[in-house]
Structures are given as C-alpha cells and as structure tokens.
C-alpha cells in the first residue's frame, strides 16, 4: 500500500495493537502490544514539529526513530532469507581505501565489490558498519555462500562459544572439531583488508539479533549513514509480508513471551509459529 499524500489519515486510524510478519518459509511472528504502536504498511507519521531547515542536522529523536525502523527491517530481511548463512567481518586497509576512518570512502569501495560479487558470484548480503574504539570502521553482516571462496583460517570457536582461538596442534584441532567446534574462515575473494567468516550455528534468532544490534551501535556512536542508508543489502533477497490489526494484549496465544520496547515504554507479547500447510495445525517455533 502506497502512502496517500493527498488524503492523509489520522494516526489513530492507521495505528494498531498487533502486527503479523509472514516470512516466505511460512513462519509467522505475531506481536501484540499493550497499546496501538504498529503503523499500517505504507504510512509514515507526519512531522508535528516545524520542518527541518535544508542542511540542518536531523534531531536525535528522528535519528533514533529511523534506527528502530531500520533495525526491524534488517532483522525481518535476514529472517526471510535463510540462504544468508555466513556471518562475516570485513575491514579495509588504509593502503587500499586511503582512510580507515572515512565511512563514505569505505562504503563506496565496499559497495563496488559487493555489486561485482552479486553479478559474478550470485551473492546475497546484508552488511552493517561498526565504529571501533579507535575510530576505525569494521563491517559485519550475513552473506550467502554463492560463488565465494572460503579459506580455513586455522582458528576455531569452541563449542561453548567465545572468541576464536588457535589450536596448539593438529591433534587439538581435530579433537575440537569432533567436540563440535566451529571453523573460522577467511574470505579469499576479499583482497582489501582483513576478513573472517563463520557459518551460523545455534539459534538463528540470536545471530540475527546480534547483526541488527550494530544499527543501534551506529546510531549511538554517531557513525552516520552510508549514502543515507543504515545498512547495505543486495542480491536476490525475499521480502516478508506485514499485516496490522487489533488484538487485546491478553489475547496473546499461550506460549507467547513478553518483551519491553524500552525506547517507547511499551509492553509487547511475541509469538512465533509455523502453520502446517496440510493440516492447518499451529506449530510453535
């Protein structure tokens, strides 16, 4: 639904207490809030304040609101595309890009490489910048394997998690792999700096939350946008479908868990499920 700028609607008419996000694999995430906080798709709130002067900086409130929208969209986009199965970290060497601290210059170089990988290697990706303590910029995201080449770095992540470690011997390496350790790869196609890649393991939801949190970090650190965007994405990516309607908070299904949206002080119950396509039975997930 496209926004009708000729006949705007009152906020009360387009705000609802429930939102269902339906993913291509049939999974549904139902969210029920204690008040109407979900806006119908295609509508945006009209600014009640005086319009921002040309060239003026956006307010902290508008930046936070934009970051929340971007984080939610990033999360949903990643959920809708299970082929995004590798978590990667990339850096750009100063000798290649000229300035490790210049977001625009890095974004331009990275985007060019990503575009080539989409065309030549059928890459699909979602990538977010992160500002490190020293001011340098790293890039984190999820990518499809596509035609990329992964080279074993020799380091592992222990079965219980933690930072990558280098086994002291081939025997220890083999023992850790047998115990369920996870290989850390380097991206052989990436020649502009450092890279790591780890195939996702464990709960996918935790990995997606980990990726989307970088938008919050970027907004808090004042890192800014890449050409007006909070994150980069490309390749063949499926989109979820969003529906809004009204349900009472206590109508949430059994098994829903409560979540506090701290930015707006709203309570929300979340329920994830898969409707069985043949029987119609609801399968929790």
Residue ranges and their predicted role:
Residues 140-143:
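Short beta-strand->loop micro-motif that forms the acidic, two-metal-ion catalytic signature
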Residues 1-135, 145-285:
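Right-hand nucleic-acid polymerase module
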